[in-house]
């Protein structure tokens, strides 16, 4: 998405604009030490676990045995569980139009904490996901663009409908909150904000009731599957005024007319469509995790299972 840190929940391609442009706040200086620092109690003792994670020591009072507290996504060592994808009898083969977000003329998306353009990440993630979905034998996938191509969004939607896609899934990475500048490498400067990790899935209510239902079902199934796999759903603290919380499923947010964002790939398709904001691109640890093969493998299996459930679970 074309988002600039410093604006809250900067999201996506709007119907009326190819890019959302904002300004970032000045570099946030380190907080000065205060007298409270001296009064801060020492952290609890820790003990290593067999897999290298650290565990809270609750023996300090009462002699209770050590209890491991596993690290939470996206901390190093936090575990993802690759779900088993189960296809019911008669599922057949479904057509998935997979949009690698951005990549239109003048629309490279946001820049990550390592100064990578969003369009580069989304194409890499979409190509990997497409291969894994195709490998199941139950999905035929068409990508919205190839490396170096500048494809308008209207052209993508027209192609998806001509091809007869069952659903449209658009991949993006998010940028949220108030970020500060930093240098990940000599000669580079971009934004960083490590406080709001997590994925989100977006859908629009701007549709007929039957299409609304199918969009909601798809978004909720994908978010539910990603959560089960160990991904953290974003709480939406920076989405106020942009999207509404979908109370049926954590990690899902709704664009409602006329007050919320009018996002082209959400409101225009006549087939179910969602955006998956895979992660917070300005979070250093989370961005690093999305370069791991295990993350991509888990994501693909979670998406596959979410798609299966959206096609087979009774409408909500």
List where the protein language model places each region.
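Catalytic-site microenvironment of enzymes
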Residues: 3-13, 20-316
